[in-house]
Amino acid sequence: MEIKNSTLASDTKASHLSYIGDAKVGGNTNIGAGTIFCNYDGKNKHRTIVGDNVFVGSNTSLIAPLKIGDASIVAAGSVISRDAPSESLAIARPLQQNKIGLGKKIMLKLQKAAYKIKR
């Protein structure tokens, strides 16, 4: 875990493989493994504020500037780019789609391309 220019209040847990930059994180909050606080837009750094009693699921990206209100939940795997009010569930990820037969078709194309490169 890496923390830069950030404060974490008491009883807050942040797991391995997370990056917390330019943030203020409230108390009794859980930051899941692999969560990234995306604070830099290529020109400026922005802050993220996470309230008290918040649960952020694993492999989540929080795109600053952003505020997550108290007692909220952020669903695992989400890319959150808008504020989440207190006591809300923030979920931002596309639904899974299963394209029957497409996996095999893509694998065959990749195998043919790899064969051409090796020759």
Q: PLM features: what roles do these ranges have?
A:
Residues M1-R119:
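Glycine-rich hexapeptide-repeat left-handed beta-helix
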